[in-house]
Every structure is written in C-alpha cells, then in structure tokens.
Design a protein with these regions (language model features):
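Mg2+/Mn2+-dependent nuclease catalytic core
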Residues: 116-220
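Short, flexible loop/turn segments with low-complexity composition
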Residues: 91, 221-222
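Metal-dependent nuclease catalytic cores that hydrolyze phosphodiester bonds in DNA/RNA
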Residues: 1-127
Length: 222
C-alpha cells in the first residue's frame, strides 16, 4: 500500500482542444493558458520530420497511434496501482511494459501527494497536467511517465526536461512546495529507464522557449 499525503488543494483546470492547439482554463476564473506541451511543440523538430518522411505518413501515424494507446493504458495502470486499487487483469501487450515499471514504483515511491495534477503559472502564462507528485526515496519530486518503442538517449528528451521544470515551477507558485528533482520513467519493451534532472538546470531555457512561443503565437493562444 502506498502512503498518501494530504491533498494539495490545487484549482481544477478544464482542457480545451482548439484548432490552434490545446489550452487549459482555470475553473471558476477567466484565465486561459496554452498547455506546456503546445508551447514546447511549437518549435520545429527536424528529426521527427525526417523520420516521418522516411517511413511515410501512414506508417508514422500508425506507429504513433499504437504507441500512444499503449502509453495511455500503462499510465492508467500506474495511476490505479498508486491509488491502491486492485489490478484484476492486465492486457498482454501492456503487461510486457508493466512488468518493468511496477518494480520501480514499488522500490522508490515512498509517498504520494497527488496524481493527474493540474498546474498553471500566472507568471509564465502556461498551464499543464503532470502525472504525479510523490516522494521518491523520500525526496519530493515531479514524476511524468513516458512510453517508448525503444530505449531513449538523454539528448533526445530535452523537451521533457523543460516540461518537468515547468511543472516544478508551477507547483511552487501555486502551493509553495519545492520539488528539486524531476523524474521521467520511460518504459519500452526493453525495460524502464529513469531520467532524473534538476529544474534549476533548465530554468533559463524554459523561459526562452516560452518567450519565443508568445512572440510567435500570442494572437492564437485562445
């Protein structure tokens, strides 16, 4: 059984998928901010474009949708498991991933603050939703689960680090809680890799990317 801390008392966000991209509205207010994934996704990614060109649009779409489906189911399992629910059955194609992720959860999560955590920053004018705020070996941390078709290199996931840095900053702004580390357990058919970083190392780059987004897309935010 996982220990759960008292609720963080965060405001709820309403997700809206617009033609211009995803935004979050702060329930009970007039505030609407672009999602952090939208902000970071605005920068061109030549390696993805090259991959899509190499395999073809149809195959790229098939691979992406299959990976997204597995990722959603794996995340749902983790959420239920950390919520101390019984997992009656696990689909075979997800079980091969779950058998890698579950031991890591058991070994390192020592307390749960919140799951599916709605976060926004008035200072940065961005919003988002992270998977988990938890104690990792006793250290308050942001945790965002990822699924991949094959193992990743740190150089491939720099935007994940910026995403996690935003979550840590927004959590501090909303609650005063400091998470000095962000973890990304990335599970593939070959195992679970856990990438760890410190938000302080990515603050300047995150600000630059947000400023770049607003300079280019301010009129299309909402």
């Amino acid at each position: 059984m996982f220990h759960h801390h008292a609720a963080l008392g965060l405001p709820r966000l309403e997700q809206r998928n617009l033609a211009t991209g995803r935004v979050y509205a702060v329930v009970g207010t007039d505030l609407v901010y672009p999602s952090i994934t939208r902000v970071l996704g605005a920068k061109p990614k030549p390696h993805l474009a090259a991959w899509r060109k190499r395999v073809g649009d149809d195959e790229a779409k098939r691979i992406s949708q299959a990976a997204s489906g597995r990722g959603t189911k794996l995340h749902s399992l983790a959420e239920r498991y950390l919520g101390n629910e019984d997992l009656d059955t696990v689909e075979p194609h997800v079980m091969e991933l779950w058998r890698y992720l579950r031991p890591w959860l058991d070994a390192h999560i020592t307390g749960v603050y919140a799951q599916e955590v709605d976060l926004y920053s008035d200072k940065l004018m961005v919003a988002g939703r992270t998977d988990l705020v938890a104690d990792i070996d006793g250290v308050p941390s942001i945790v965002d689960f990822k699924q991949a078709n094959k193992p990743k290199k740190a150089s491939y996931i720099q935007d994940y680090y910026l995403q996690g840095t935003f979550y840590a900053l927004a959590l501090y702004e909303r609650t005063g809680m400091k998470c000095k580390q962000v973890l990304f357990p990335i599970t593939s058919p070959e195992g679970t890799q856990v990438f760890v970083t410190k938000p302080a190392e990515h603050y300047d780059e995150l600000l630059a990317r947000i400023e770049e987004f607003y300079a280019s897309y301010a009129e299309a935010v909402v």
